[in-house]
Amino acid sequence: MSPREMTGHTCPLRGAAPARAPLRRASGRRARVLVVDHPGSARSVLAAVLRGAGYHVALVASGPAALAELERQGADVLLTDLYMPEMSGWDLTRLVRARGIASTRGRPLCVGLSSAVLSGVSRAQLARAQVDFAITKPGDPEAILETVERALAWAEVA
């Protein structure tokens, strides 16, 4: 798969990664996913899908809360809604990158969540914002898990 090729509900932007990654880090600790989205059914479904697959999931409702959580606990993957009122996912991603907020894997991998992310947002916009992967929501559970696994796999080979 080419680095800029869109397939299904996922949009890899940083190059090909192994198709599957283990749910546990080398240390044996479950991978931690920080989900940033306003409360609602999409957030609940996303959390249930990730927890059902064995991930440790933390939920926050805003960009500022996400920054505080990343500084306090870190994360292996950051899944953020791109369109939030207080601080957009675009702005959150830029701040995370600019501040160099490190996770247990070196830096959080951002996933933009939006119902129109693949049809209304260009790959160039995602790349400029340094978003690693994009999925539509609510999205297919298998596509969501595949995206998170690719993000973790990319972190292992980057």
Q: Would you name each region that the model predicts?
A:
Residues M1-L34, H38, S44-A47, G106, ...:
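Non-catalytic signal-transmission and effector/linker regions of two-component phosphorelay proteins
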Residues G40-A58, A129:
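Two-component/phosphorelay signaling modules centered on CheY-like receiver
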Residues L59, E86-M87:
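Residue-level signal for the "D+5" position in two-component response regulator receiver
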Residues L59-V77:
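Acidic, metal-coordinating helix/loop segments flanking the phosphotransfer/catalytic sites
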Residues D81, P85:
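Active-site residues of response regulator receiver
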Residues S103-G120, V131:
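A short, hydrophobic beta-strand element within the central beta-sheet of small alpha/beta folds
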Residues T136-P138:
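A Lys-centered signature of the CheY-like receiver
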